[in-house]
Amino acid sequence: MVRNIMAKEFSRTRRIAQQLQQELAQVLQRDMKDPRIGFVTVNDVDVSRDLSYAKVFVTFFEEDKAVVQEKLNALISAAPYIRTLVAGRMKLRVMPELRFIYDSSLVEGMRMSNLVSQVINQDKAKQQQFGSEDASVEDEVLGDDVADDADETEGKD
């Protein structure tokens, strides 16, 4: 019996978190006019079991840590307003307090992917460069050997 209640609570908080993520993404994209925030992606939302708090994991496509911190501070200062906008869209008795947290995993993943792509491209360039040089060296060596073989066979006749 206790297990079923716990499972239902978890699924409800997860459903609320998913809906909150969707609503936050729409509000931040359409309704927020603050130029300090710019383009923001809501990666995940983690709602507490009592629905009093929600950790909102966001990403800005910026590499400069100072700019990221400014954007995060702008979101944090706008959190009560954002909460009000989202509360109007969701039918909850208690609207969780929003706590914005910068999530660098997406940016780090993109950075790692770019590094891997660069290494692959450099490796291909080296293979083409050395591969064509090796082929020309092989042609020269084989060409000389073939010519030597031809000379030897002509001399035997």
From Swiss-Prot:
Keyword Cytoplasm: yes
InterPro entries, alphabetized: KH_dom-like_a/b (IPR015946), RbfA (IPR000238), RbfA_dom_sf (IPR023799), Ribosome-bd_factorA_CS (IPR020053)
Cellular component GO terms, alphabetical: cytosol
GO biological process: maturation of SSU-rRNA
Biased composition range(s): Acidic residues: 135-157
GO molecular-function term, one example from the UniProt record: ribosomal small subunit binding
Subunit annotation: Monomer. Binds 30S ribosomal subunits, but not 50S ribosomal subunits or 70S ribosomes.
Protein name: Ribosome-binding factor A
Source organism (scientific name): Shewanella baltica (strain OS155 / ATCC BAA-1091)
